[in-house]
Curated annotation (Swiss-Prot):
Keywords: Bromination, Disulfide bond, Hydroxylation, Ion channel impairing toxin, Neurotoxin, Secreted, Toxin. This is Mu-conotoxin-like Cal 12.1.2d. Mu-conotoxins block voltage-gated sodium channels. This toxin reversibly blocks voltage-gated sodium channel in cephalopods, with no alteration in the voltage dependence of sodium conductance or on the kinetics of inactivation. The modification 4-hydroxyproline is found at P23, P40. It comes from Californiconus californicus.
C-alpha cells in the first residue's frame, strides 16, 4: 500500500495531516494541505 506522505512515521493515505485544532485548519484538497476546514477522511496506518 503506497503512502501519499508520512507524518510522525505514520502513513497518510489522502496526503495530508488534518487536525481540527491546527492553526490554519490545515486539511486536504486536490492542491494539497490548503483547504481551511476539517476533513475527517484522513486515514493513518
Amino acid at each position: 500500500d503506497v503512502c501519499d506522505s508520512l507524518v510522525g512515521g505514520r502513513c497518510i493515505h489522502n496526503g495530508c495531516w488534518c487536525e481540527r485544532s491546527a492553526p490554519h485548519g490545515n486539511c486536504c484538497n486536490t492542491s494539497g494541505c490548503t483547504a481551511r476546514w476539517w476533513c475527517p477522511g484522513t486515514k493513518f496506518d
